Each structure stands twice: as structure tokens, then as C-alpha cells.
């Protein structure tokens, strides 16, 4: 996944991919931009496509996911590329179970049927018992502590493979809840254990008053983690240290599977919807960060 314009990193990863394939037929470029005008995506796609064609002597398969009638759609159709559409009503941060998330994950070898089953189960379980569901409990827990001035919400993942999920969590909460007219602003933070224990955790323990934390432990499906016992001890130690500082904490355990991760992500989206409804904030409108594109 190429997600930022960094020349050295992009060059290194791209040439690593090229050296690992026998022909261009093993490569597909999946370009995602709802507006079709995102500068980073456009530059990356052009650079990757031209580099592959130059070295492997043939254009790679290109798959485009974009909004209808965008410039990207028009250029893709003219080039006979494969095109998937993202509906106008679906915002980027809520698009993980649309073509935006499912197509690249399928290309990457993930089981998207299990992803959809996990997401669907979260919705079905909430509909059956909305007042006692984990989604409702988390939303009310956050609202309660917001009223006490705790507005820094940290999701601390004790699993290095969860770093990208953590970034998605931050974007989801920041763009959905971080609005000018929201007096109960919640500042989302993601950290990864054990790396961030001596950085973010230090700040949390030292300045405990604004924080509330969800401690997440991702459990491998196969019990072959040689460091599991040590990581479990560090997880529980870090959690207990936060409790000793009177920081409100939640514990969450997730199996490292498509089903469980999708279920957790869908629950987070539902939490945001409940929070936004309670605080009368529009979670779906365009965030102010889009201003940079016109500057």
C-alpha cells in the first residue's frame, strides 16, 4: 500500500516489488480517489505506472476506484482501465466496507467475505439489543468522561500489525467528531505497544487528567507467537499503571482475523454515529482539512 509521497520510500518499495515478480502480469495498480483530484494519489499512480512500464516494458493492469463523473473516472475509461464507483454519500473514512476497502484487500489476498460477515454481525447484534450493546456502552462511557473534561481518547494497540487500523481510528474520530461547532471536542490518539510506552504512555501517566484509554490486544489465530507471554505481561503492566493513575480504561481483545477486525471497525463507526447524534454533530459532512487542496 502506497499512501504518501515519499521519494526514497516509494522508490525502495517499488523496486522491491519489481525484483520479486517474473512479469508485469503479476502486478495490478489500484488507484483510489473519491474526488479524482487528490494530488498525492495522482502523483503516486503516475510515477508507479511509468516506472513499471519503463522497466517491465508493458503497462500494468490499472484498477480505479473513484466517484462518478470525476476526472479520474473519465481518464480511466478512455484508457480502458477497470473502474469501480464510490457512491457520493459514502465518505472516505466510512468506506472501508465499500469498493474502496474491499477491492484492494481482495487483491492483497484477504478474505473479504469474512470481513463483510464481521461487519454485518456488529450491526445485527446492535439492532437486537441496542441499549446493552458494546457500542452503546462505549459511546456513553465516552460522553460521561467528556463531561468530566477527559477529551483525549487513546487507543493503545499492543500489536505492531495494527498500526494502520490505529491510523484509521484517528481519522474516523477526528474527521467525524472534530467540528468547529462541537463544544465537546474529542481528540483521538493511536499508539502501538510496546514501542510507544516510553513516549505516549509517559505523557499519559504524567498528565493523566485529560485521558481515557482503550487498551487493545490483538490475539494471533495460531498460537505461534514466541513473545506472547512477554507481551501479555507488558500489556497488563501498562494497563495497571494507567489504572493506578486513576485514568479511565477499557480492555478489548481481538482475534487477528478478518471477521473480528471488521467487527471492531464497524462498531467504531457506530460509536461515532451515536456520539454525533447525542452531541448534535454532523459526522458525515466534509471536514475542514479539505481546505489544503485549494491553497
Regions found by a protein language model. Give the residues of each.
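Acidic catalytic cores of enzymes that act on phosphate-bearing nucleotides/polynucleotides
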Residues: 1, 13-14, 110-114, 124-253
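Glycine-rich phosphate-binding loops that contact phosphosugars or nucleotide phosphates
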Residues: 1-129
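Short glycine/proline-rich, acidic loop/turn segments that cap or connect secondary-structure elements
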Residues: 260-274
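C-terminal amphipathic alpha-helical interaction region
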Residues: 282-295
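A generic structural motif
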Residues: 32-38, 90, 104-110, 160-161, ...
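Active-site regions of enzymes building and remodeling cell-envelope glycoconjugates
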Residues: 78-83, 245-248, 258
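A short acidic, often aromatic-flanked loop/helix-cap motif at beta-alpha or helix-coil junctions
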Residues: 9-12, 89-95, 194-198, 256-262
Amino acid at each position: 500500500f502506497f499512501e504518501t509521497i515519499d521519494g526514497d520510500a516509494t522508490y525502495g518499495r517499488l523496486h522491491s516489488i519489481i525484483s520479486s515478480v517474473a512479469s508485469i502480469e503479476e502486478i495490478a495498480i489500484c488507484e483510489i480517489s473519491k474526488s479524482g483530484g487528490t494530488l498525492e494519489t495522482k502523483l503516486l499512480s503516475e510515477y508507479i505506472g511509468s516506472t513499471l512500464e519503463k522497466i517491465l516494458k508493458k503497462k500494468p493492469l490499472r484498477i480505479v476506484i473513484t466517484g462518478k463523473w470525476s476526472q479520474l473516472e473519465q481518464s480511466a475509461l478512455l484508457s480502458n482501465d477497470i473502474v469501480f464507483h464510490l457512491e457520493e454519500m459514502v465518505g472516505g473514512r466510512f468506506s472501508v466496507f465499500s469498493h474502496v476497502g474491499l477491492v484492494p484487500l481482495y487483491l492483497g489476498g484477504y478474505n473479504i467475505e469474512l470481513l463483510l460477515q464481521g461487519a454485518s454481525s456488529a450491526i445485527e447484534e446492535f439492532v437486537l439489543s441496542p441499549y446493552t450493546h458494546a457500542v452503546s456502552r462505549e459511546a456513553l462511557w465516552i460522553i460521561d468522561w467528556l463531561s468530566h473534561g477527559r477529551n483525549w481518547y487513546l487507543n493503545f494497540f499492543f500489536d505492531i500489525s495494527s498500526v494502520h487500523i490505529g491510523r484509521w481510528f484517528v481519522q474516523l474520530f477526528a474527521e467525524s467528531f472534530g467540528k468547529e461547532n462541537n463544544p465537546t471536542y474529542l481528540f483521538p490518539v493511536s499508539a502501538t505497544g510496546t514501542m510507544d510506552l516510553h513516549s505516549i504512555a509517559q505523557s499519559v501517566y504524567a498528565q493523566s487528567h485529560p485521558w481515557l484509554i482503550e487498551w487493545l490486544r490483538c490475539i494471533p489465530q495460531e498460537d505461534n507467537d514466541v513473545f506472547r507471554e512477554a507481551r501479555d505481561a507488558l500489556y497488563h503492566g501498562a494497563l495497571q499503571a494507567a489504572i493506578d493513575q486513576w485514568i479511565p480504561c477499557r480492555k478489548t481483545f481481538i482475534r487477528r482475523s478478518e471477521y473480528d477486525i471488521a467487527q471492531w471497525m464497524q462498531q467504531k463507526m457506530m460509536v461515532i454515529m451515536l456520539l454525533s447524534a447525542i452531541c448534535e454533530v454532523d459526522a458525515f459532512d466534509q471536514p475542514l482539512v479539505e481546505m489544503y487542496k485549494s491553497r
